[in-house]
C-alpha cells in the first residue's frame, strides 16, 4: 500500500473512531466469510465491522483522541465501530463469540475508557439504555402511587379518628 492510500485509510478510520459511541476489538482468525456476514447482520445498520492494518488503526485511534489501544491492536484484529446503543452491540458480540469460538474479544473503548478483554465482556452484562429507562419510569410510577396512597391515607385516618371520638362521646353521654 502506497503512502497516499495509507493516509486515506487513516483519515477514514479516524473519522470512524470519532463518530463511534464505542469500539470493540476482536480477533477474527478462523471465522468464515458467511460467519462474518452473519455477525455484521446481527450487529445491525448502525455498526460497522472492519479489518484494518493495526499500524494504521493505532495512528487513527490516536488522531481521534483514543489512547491505550496499542496493546490490544496486535495480531489479526477486526474493529467494530458502534453508533448508538453500545451495550446491545456488546451483547451481540459476546453471544456470537460463545457460539463461534474463533471470534475472540480483545478489548473495547467506550465513553472515553479503554477496556481489556474482561472489561469488554463485562460491558455486555450491563443493562441497555431502554432497560434502564423502563426501570426508572417504573420506579417513578411506583413512588407516585405510594405518595398518592399516603396522601389519601392521612385524611381517611383523621376522619376515622374523629368518628371514633364522636362515637365514644355519644356512648359516654
Swiss-Prot record:
Q: Which domain of life is it from?
A: Bacteria
Which InterPro entries has this protein been placed in? Answer: Ribosomal_uL10 (IPR001790), Ribosomal_uL10-like_sf (IPR043141), Ribosomal_uL10_bac (IPR022973), Ribosomal_uL10_bac_type (IPR047865), Ribosomal_uL10_CS_bac (IPR002363)
Keyword Ribonucleoprotein in annotation: yes
Give one GO molecular function term.
large ribosomal subunit rRNA binding
List, in alphabetical order, the GO biological process terms annotated in this UniProt record: translation
Gene3D superfamilies on file: 3.30.70.1730, 6.10.250.290
Query: What are the annotated disulfide bridges?
Result: none
Its GO CC terms are:
large ribosomal subunit
Coiled-coil stretches are: none
- Assembly behavior: Part of the ribosomal stalk of the 50S ribosomal subunit. The N-terminus interacts with L11 and the large rRNA to form the base of the stalk. The C-terminus forms an elongated spine to which L12 dimers bind in a sequential fashion forming a multimeric L10(L12)X complex.
What family does the entry list?
Belongs to the universal ribosomal protein uL10 family.
The protein here is known as Large ribosomal subunit protein uL10
- Designated gene of the protein: rplJ
